[in-house]
Amino acid sequence: PRVALGLGSVAGLGAAHLACSHYSVMVKEKSAVFVAGPPVVEQIGQKLSKNELGGYEIQLKSGAVDDAVDTEEEAFDAAKKFLSYLPNSVYQLSDQIISKDDPKRTSEWLIEAIPKNIKSV
């Protein structure tokens, strides 16, 4: 798996790597992810801050990143937690646990999330 942490401004190819990771984390109020930064965007007549252009709220809403935390330490902790769910090697299986979730449980939201008529929204 690929894990990426946005610990500051991430632009261009680095932004693509962050967005294509299996799990990605940004630091709120510190990180920004964009193809081109504010100076480049200003050349086409739009003056935007780093946060307006690619702050954590925009990236979470668009699905470009998976998580946002308050500090760099929390970002590393989140990455460690994600990796803790995986085996140490491709030659090992993940630990199995007995789920306490009712296997017959239904979720109305999931049932309604995909319309029965795929031509309607």
Q: What annotation goes with each model-predicted range?
A:
Residues 71-121:
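Terminal amphipathic helices with adjacent charged low-complexity linkers/tails
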Residues 1-91:
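Conserved catalytic cores of soluble enzyme domains
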